[in-house]
Amino acid sequence: MLFRSDINVAEVHDAFSVCELMAISELGITANDKSGEFVRDLFNTENRMINPRGGLIGAGHPLGATGISQTIEIATQLRGKSEKRQISNLKTGLVHNMSAAGTSSSVMVLEN
């Protein structure tokens, strides 16, 4: 079983702001009623654990290639090659993606 404490970095689907809040609560990264506070705290402390490259809103949303771009970011993070946005001491990363209108989702866990 995977626990929140096992995930060091995550790329979650955030093409719309509400998607990030829904994803982190449904993935168990935070409690359902705490996702807004969690994201606010990440921002205020400059913690890049969630969407270290700025998410889909900040880095772009390449239709048809979103999942692979998120996967590349997590793999690059785990390899220690993310330069300025590198998070230290990573062992486990998570990639979450959704299709149009949330009709399907995928979740992948990568380990170093």
Predicted regions and their residues:
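Extracellular interaction modules
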Residues: 1
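Claisen-condensing/thiolase-fold acyl-transfer catalytic domains that form or cleave C-C bonds
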Residues: 4-112
